Amino acid sequence: MPDTNAVVVVNTAAVPIAVTSHWHFFEANRQLDFDRAAAWGRRLAIPTGSTIRWEPGETHTVTLRPFAGRRIAYGFAGLVNGPLDADGALPAALALARDRGYLGVGA
C-alpha cells in the first residue's frame, strides 16, 4: 500500500460536511462522492485534530495515508467493524455501503 494517495471528493449534500483527521475516510458521509475503494484503510493526511470542510457542491482533492498499527476499524459508520486487511473485508464493506446509499461505491 503506498504511503499516500490523492482522492477527488465532491459534496453532493445541501449542507456543509466536515471530516476529521482520525476518521476512516472510506466511511465518511454517504453524500460525499469519491472513490471509496481508494480510501479503504486510510485517513486524511492532515495534522491530528484538524478538519476538512466541504460546502454544498464544493470539490477538494485530499491526500490520504494508511492507518498504522493493528489496522482494525470499529465504529465510525459501522461499515467495517473488524480488521481492515481481512479477506473479503473490502468487498463486504462496499456492498454494505451500496445498500446504505453511499456514493462512490460503483453500480
Enumerate the language-model features and the residues they cover.
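Short, surface-exposed loop/turn motifs at beta-strand boundaries within globular domains
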Residues: 1-2, 12
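Short acidic, flexible loop segments centered on an aromatic residue
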Residues: 16-38
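Intrinsic-disorder/low-complexity, polar/charged segments enriched in Ser/Thr/Lys/Arg/Asp/Glu/Gln
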Residues: 2-6, 59-61
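Short alpha-helical interface elements
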Residues: 32-34, 44, 48, 79-89
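Intrinsically disordered, low-complexity Pro/Gly/Ser/Thr-rich segments with frequent PxxP/GP/PP motifs
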Residues: 34-70
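Asparagine-centered strand-capping/turn motif at beta-strand->loop junctions
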Residues: 7-16
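Copper-binding active sites and cupredoxin-like electron-transfer domains
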Residues: 26, 48-49, 76-77
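Terminal connector regions
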Residues: 61-107
